[in-house]
Amino acid sequence: MPNGSDEKISVAPIIAAIEAPYLSDLSERDKPWDKHRKNTDKVSAHYRGSEFNVLADRTSFCSEFLDFRLTPGDEGELRLKLSTARFCRVRHCPVCQWRRSLMWKAKAYKVLPQIVEKYPKHRWLFVTLTVKNCPIAELRATLTWMNESFKRLTKLKDWPAQGWLKSVEVTRGKDGSAHPHFHCLLLVPPSYFSHGYLSQAKWVELWQRCLRVDYQPVMDVQAVKKGAQPMSLVPELLKYCVKESDLVADREWFLELTRQLHKTRAIGTGGVLKQYLKELEEEPEDLIGQEETGEPDEGHLYFGWRKREKKYKLVDY
């Protein structure tokens, strides 16, 4: 799974240093590094001069230097794999958010086949639960209310899932409001589609009842085809809590977001899936990716962040 980069490179390090001084020139797959690090500079600038000045310092030094190992590919070509980097681990750092998502996805891809093997006849639902937009200053209270409502939902007699994975996403409204919503992967028994099926209208009714509101909330319910694997849903489930364009769009909105989401959880698990996926609820210790044991090391390439150029450039070490 994601472990630096698997992009194949058919050039020797010396030639690469002369003809392709930037990471993005060497590895197509590693181009996202430039985008995420550029946005990290913007986030750092947002934090500067606020009560989060310490976060400004931490993000400004995040992933300034990347050490990639050169490893042989199947056909003798060289591949880049991230070996060493220092991350700030600030929750809303775009680089760390990206790396965290990669690690979460890697764990999910590893564990989900075990669940499918354990429950081969069960089916999967992908459910999105929403509420009306709220002022950004009321985001924490809104999420608390949504989590309490979700807990009520799971205790209803009609609740069909035997296990679930829930992630939080917050998007920025055009008027500066916040739109929090849940993405949920539900494991349901085979009988769900024969005599326990819930229509879209019924789902809306149940969610409205648990929210205790006088409007019909917007929902989306999709069933994974019979025999299909749930892995295709992982990217949507475990992508990010707040997309980068929203993080950098407005400084005051972003600072309030930081206050509102402080010490809140982005991922929750329950039912029979908790024992398999509980690790996703915690901050991953490893943001690089475990190395494959016994893999040959053909040398290293080092890249430093160049703020003016907004690119990672090959450097001597």
Positions of PLM-derived features:
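Right-hand nucleic-acid polymerase module
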Residues: 1-178, 188-317
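Cys/His-rich zinc-coordinating modules
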Residues: 184
